[in-house]
A protein has these predicted regions:
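N-terminal catalytic or cofactor-binding beta/alpha core of small enzyme domains
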Residues: 1-66, 71-150
Length: 150
């Protein structure tokens, strides 16, 4: 079965750049014919273009297991943790931008506190330490490479 890694986020906002940074770390380091990486610092995948990206993927790659990577907001005590769930991910939920869910495995790096308010969450994502993003992206990238033996 093909494994499709979708790294969600935008390089325009530090707190939302975790996915693209992981994609950047993985993109040229995966040398297996059945593993595909989508989303990096140059080609962002967000709630705005996810439908088009999925349509393209589904036309090109059959029988896929989807692994999604994104930054997330949560309780203050979870900041810096990586949450792995064998379930779908909802894209753009911190900013109430989407209720579209998909995927088989979700990897979320907790980058800030969920304030339960769209404007406060937007500000939270824009005030994340780049060091936290770098550390989480390194941790996630290394684990993926180890698990997939690439």
């Amino acid at each position: 079965m093909n494994k499709v890694i979708i790294c969600i986020g935008t390089s325009k906002c530090i707190g939302d750049s975790l996915g693209p940074l992981v994609g950047e770390n993985l993109y040229n380091r995966i040398n297996k014919s059945n593993i595909y990486v989508f989303g990096n610092l140059k080609n962002n995948i967000t709630y705005q273009n996810i439908d088009a990206v999925l349509s393209k993927i589904n036309k090109q790659i059959k029988e896929s297991y989807f692994i999604l990577i994104d930054s997330a907001l949560s309780k203050k005590e979870n900041i810096g943790k990586v949450i792995l769930t064998k379930d779908k991910m909802t894209i753009g939920s911190a900013l109430n931008k989407s209720n579209f869910s998909f995927g088989d495995l979700s990897i979320k790096g907790i980058v800030g506190e969920n304030k339960d308010n769209e404007i406060k969450n937007f500000n939270e994502l824009n005030n994340v330490s780049i060091n936290l993003i770098k550390e989480l992206s390194k941790q996630i990238s290394n684990k993926i490479k180890k698990v997939l033996s690439v």
